[in-house]
Amino acid sequence: MKKLLAIGILCIMVTAVMSGCVSEKEININNSNKITTNMPVSEKNITKILKYAKNMNLIYYDENGNIVNPYNGDKWKYKVFIDATGQKFLLKNKDDPVPSWAKEKLGDNFKVINVPLTRVIVMSSTEIALMEAINDDGSVIGSVKGIMWGKSYKWYFKDINKSLAEGKIIDVGSSSNPNWDKIIEINPQVIFVYPGYDGDKIIAKCKELGITYVADAEYLENDPLGRCEWVKMFAAFYNKEPEAKRYFEKVEDNCLKVINKTKNCPKVTVAWGYNSQWGCYVPENNSYVAKEIMFYCNGDYIFKDLNGTGSAKINYETFAERAKDADVWVVPSSTAWLSTFKEDNPGYETFKAVKNGRVFCESDDYWQLGLLKTDEVIMDLATILHPEAFKGRKTHFFLKYNIENNTATPFIAK
């Protein structure tokens, strides 16, 4: 499952970002680490909830149907969420009526959900990650009654481990073969599901059984902060807007600080990828991974001329020809999956990054905790690219990889 998730997250749609320039609108970061753009004043909508996420829509209303923004301190009465498949949801507190203006604004095809949710099923550990961000009182994770792949891999969230062991959360099978009898028995208010891959089959079955699903397309976002901003979707379903605001503003602020800290650093060339039994995959130049490298961390990605929004499968010879001269080589996997790395990547010992000890891999918990700690992931990446700017910092998610004995240790910048 971890491998499938890793490949799936790499294969995403993203906004074009080239080294030294910013996609769409020019972005400036002032001394207070706040983003400003050159967009017209009319576009600076004070009621806009989402700054980075593009695959959903979220609107808040007062009781009279006026748009408000709780992230600016406004009081709300109703919420409208439009998921990645275009479904419209009116979210309201249990005792509140459906407002008279609902059909005028939403049409006839919308679903009403009482919030906060108390009984849900999730498809992925990355959904759990964003739920953890707003789980201050335990009620959000407490609402999770079923998880796909629940007992199929190690969990790095202690509360999930405990609830699975105690039977408070049920493993409802894999995403490719869910146990629908268990799912029906749980009778969830909502199943959070990823569209695409196995998710489309789950969506079809939910429609057949009359089970409400919400399509979470965080993994398709074009920016690491766009992925992280899906925390606001979960906040809407749990009335946790204040918690989401505190969490996201902290993550955003830390990420913007990285941009400011690295923008004047000398560029280093970065190879990202490796060869395995599944082939050699590399991020395309418009992928969120390439954006992390080039925009957030001021690196020079070796395949910045490879157009696309996800990942591309290339032959190893093509990869090696460029990677051999890269300053830094990031192997996007953990050592648990790299036992045949030396055999799969012939000639690696001649690579510049190998000779200079600048090969890095991912931590075991990267695919669970990484989304929750988006800012730490970006800070880690910046640290291994520009150690001179982060002296004394110890990494967690990107580890120094010892190819010869397939081990990895935290990197301390000097």
UniProtKB/Swiss-Prot annotation:
Domain Fe/B12 periplasmic-binding: 119-389
Sorted UniProt keywords: Cell membrane, Lipoprotein, Membrane, Signal
SUPFAM superfamilies recorded: Helical backbone' metal receptor
GO cellular component, one term: plasma membrane
Pfam hit, one: Peripla_BP_2
Sites of S-archaeol cysteine lipidation: C21
Signal sequence, start to end: 1-20
Name listed for the protein in its UniProt record: Uncharacterized lipoprotein MJ0878
